[in-house]
């Protein structure tokens, strides 16, 4: 019973429904993050550099900092890899029967999404400020094309929104999973029943329900000189007229 809808996934071993899977908000956000990561990687690697007419090597359009362009391409590449891994992990979630393993998977999803959200937020402002600070030499004869660099900035912003949305839904799934797994189950409810009810009395009055527990109640004695024994009445039974274990 604990595996049913544990941490946003259904019963372990359930059939995979791709139509339902690709309609999930987390999957949609990760697909968007994958696409924007590809755009960032391609835009910066192909159009984030400029070769001045008097230089041998090209310079990065983001403030002439080669490390910034390398950082942008690396972030785009790892964002694509991370989105693919998390999509596959979400697709395999229904096959995981262990609730603690599901908890660790959702927690890893939350941590990775939050890290990429912070990285893209920092990267967006960094790329924007450094592209604005790029200055062209007056004697440079080669025209500068900044369209790809600007697409890189836009894709960094959109990646921030996509990973932020994925992190939000991962956090919601983690919180809902914690609440579901910490709710008292039937055994805990049964353990809270007072001992005078457990000893000698069954729920429902017969074998229906949980069944007869202990020995039958003592019969009243009518021998001469002996006071009649009174049978203690059990408290009201919330499981009366219930079948099985009430699940």
Curated annotation (Swiss-Prot):
Biological process annotations from GO: regulation of exocytosis; synaptic vesicle transport
MARVEL domain ranges (all copies): 21-175
Topological relation to the membrane, as annotated: Multi-pass membrane protein
Protein name: Synaptogyrin homolog 1
Bias kind Polar residues: ranges: 220-247
Gene Ontology CC terms, in alphabetical order: cytoplasmic vesicle; neuromuscular junction; synaptic vesicle; synaptic vesicle membrane
Species this protein is from: Caenorhabditis elegans
Subcellular location field: Membrane
Record keywords: Membrane, Transmembrane, Transmembrane helix
Top-level taxonomic group: Eukaryota
Segments for region (Disordered): 206-247
Keyword check for Mitochondrion: no
Family: Belongs to the synaptogyrin family.
Stretches that traverse the bilayer: 25-45, 69-89, 105-125, 151-171
Tissue specificity of this protein: Expressed in a wide variety of neurons and is expressed weakly in the non-neuronal distal tip cells. A punctate pattern was observed in the ventral and dorsal nerve cords and the nerve ring. Weak expression is seen in neuronal cell bodies and commissures.
């Amino acid at each position: 019973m604990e595996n049913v809808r544990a941490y946003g996934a259904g019963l372990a071993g359930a059939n995979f429904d791709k139509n339902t899977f690709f309609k999930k908000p987390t999957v949609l956000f990760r697909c968007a993050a994958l696409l924007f990561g590809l755009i960032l990687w391609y835009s910066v690697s192909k159009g984030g550099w400029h070769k001045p007419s008097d230089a041998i090597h090209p310079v990065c359009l983001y403030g002439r900092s080669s490390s910034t362009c390398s950082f942008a391409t690396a972030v785009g590449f790892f964002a694509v890899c991370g989105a693919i891994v998390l999509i596959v992990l979400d697709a395999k979630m229904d096959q995981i029967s262990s609730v603690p393993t599901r908890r660790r998977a959702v927690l890893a999803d939350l941590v990775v999404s939050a890290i990429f959200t912070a990285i893209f937020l920092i990267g967006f402002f960094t790329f924007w400020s450094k592209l604005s600070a790029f200055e062209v030499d007056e004697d440079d004869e080669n025209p500068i094309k900044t369209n790809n660099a600007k697409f890189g900035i836009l894709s960094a912003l959109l990646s921030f929104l996509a990973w932020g949305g994925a992190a939000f839904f991962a956090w919601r799934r983690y919180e809902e999973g914690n609440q579901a797994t910490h709710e008292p189950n039937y055994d805990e409810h049964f353990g809270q029943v007072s001992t005078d009810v457990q000893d000698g009395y069954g729920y429902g009055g017969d074998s229906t329900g949980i069944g007869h527990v202990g020995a039958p109640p003592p019969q009243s004695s009518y021998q001469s000189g002996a006071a009649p024994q009174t049978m203690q009445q059990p408290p009201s039974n919330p499981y009366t007229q219930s079948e099985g274990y009430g699940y």
